[in-house]
A protein has these predicted regions:
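Active-site gating/metal-coordination segments in enzymes
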Residues: 4, 83-181, 188, 233-238
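Histidine-centered catalytic micro-motifs
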Residues: 16-26, 200-203
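Conserved, mostly hydrophobic/aromatic
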Residues: 20, 73, 105, 132, ...
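Active-site gating loops and adjacent loop-to-helix segments of metal-dependent hydrolytic enzymes
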Residues: 25-72, 127-153, 196-197, 228-231, ...
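Acidic-and-aromatic substrate-binding clefts and catalytic sites of carbohydrate-active enzymes
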Residues: 51, 79-86, 109-117, 178-184, ...
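A general structural detector for well-ordered alpha-helical segments in enzyme core domains, enriched
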Residues: 59-64, 88-95, 116-123, 159-166, ...
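Catalytic pocket-lining loop regions of alpha/beta-barrel enzymes
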Residues: 150-266
Length: 344
């Protein structure tokens, strides 16, 4: 593991919401083929044997360093067997009832199929369900991007993009996860869905750290940031082609904060996956270090409160009180509002 831990000593117990993590019990209730069957070849972080074991709420709580209080979290679908999207949502809802985590769940649905609407509506029975992470077909490298242009399941596929309309109709959000060479394409696709709430995963996945690759990443991030309904998670800067370096990744975090502004950045760990490269404390401290570099002293604490806590409340409409009480920071005090309703 490559890890450099930056030490942050808060003057008080800092409330924290982790806006992206995964749970799995591997006990037969929900199947995870990538964890329980043959390992996936070319996993983007390399050998992942260390996470092929249960990771549940108690494990996440133990990772939070002294000086911080984990007051909520957002669970993101964890590549469960695709026939078990509803089972995963139900299992996560049971975990919250027992362990008080997570505060919200981002599920999955089969975009581009006749079953998508029903899958969304069934999951809306859970008071935790806020939206889905459905991944479009993407190219494996920047050089091969044209190989998927216009193909079924891609961002140019009108049938697949009907899923985005279904989310909008149901007031659900979309967790967007594509590598950097598809960011501008995603920004273009979203122009047809101006009311859709979107949360970009993992800093836009700047896997290609060449000058050309980073230039394309910046262009894509700026294109998405031009849409006021897009936020970004400060999470997962591991790359399949470059070593994990704290200093370089800290610079990328600063760029994300500059492009999107602190109001649209959410702290997120992507644990346990990110734990293959960095400790929880190390990642949290790296995010805080970037915030401190990008913020004047008089605004530092309020900015920390936004990125580490309040922004997750706003973007995922969590039933948790905010800290900064800015007009733009709101929360839904009635989480059952997101329970199943008849589709319009």
């Amino acid at each position: 593991m490559t890890d450099t831990t930056f030490r942050h000593e808060p003057s008080h117990s800092q409330p924290l919401i982790d806006a992206h993590h995964h749970f799995w019990a591997l006990d037969g209730q929900v199947a995870y083929p990538w964890l329980e069957e043959s390992p996936v070849e070319d996993f983007f972080l390399g050998d992942y044997a260390a996470i092929r074991r249960p990771f549940v709420a108690a494990d996440l709580k133990r990772l939070v360093p002294e000086g911080f209080r984990l007051v909520g979290s957002v669970h993101c679908e964890a590549e469960a067997a695709r026939s078990q999207a509803l089972e995963e949502t139900r299992w996560i809802t049971q975990q919250q009832a027992t362990h008080a985590l997570p505060s919200a769940h981002v599920g999955w649905a089969a975009f581009g199929t006749d079953e998508c609407a029903a899958q969304l509506d069934d999951q809306r029975d859970s008071p935790l369900f806020r939206g889905v992470r459905a991944k479009p077909v993407t190219a494996a490298t920047p050089r091969t991007r044209q190989s998927v242009a216009g193909t079924s399941g891609s961002l140019q596929d009108p049938r697949w993009c009907e899923g985005l309309a279904l989310l909008t109709d149901r007031d659900l959000s979309w967790d967007l996860r594509v590598p950097a060479w598809h960011l501008e394409e995603a920004a273009t696709a979203l122009q047809d869905y101006p009311d859709l709430r979107v949360i970009l995963n993992h800093c836009g996945l700047p896997w290609d750290r060449t000058p050309e690759g980073l230039a394309e990443w910046r262009d894509g991030m700026q294109a998405l940031a031009a849409n006021p309904n897009v936020a970004v998670k400060l999470s997962e800067l591991g790359s399949p082609w470059h070593d994990w370096e704290a200093s370089a990744n800290g610079e990328l975090l600063c760029e994300v904060l500059d492009i999107f502004g602190a109001q649209r950045c959410l702290f997120a760990s992507n644990f346990p996956v990110s734990g293959l490269k960095v400790s929880y404390d190390g990642w949290l401290s790296l995010v805080i270090s970037a915030i401190e570099q990008m913020t004047s002293a008089d605004l530092r604490q309020s900015t920390l409160d936004k990125v580490l806590h309040d922004n997750a409340i706003h973007w995922y409409r969590l039933p948790i009180a905010g800290i900064t009480h800015d007009a733009a920071i709101t929360h839904d005090a009635n989480p059952t509002r997101h329970a199943r309703q008849e589709a319009p």
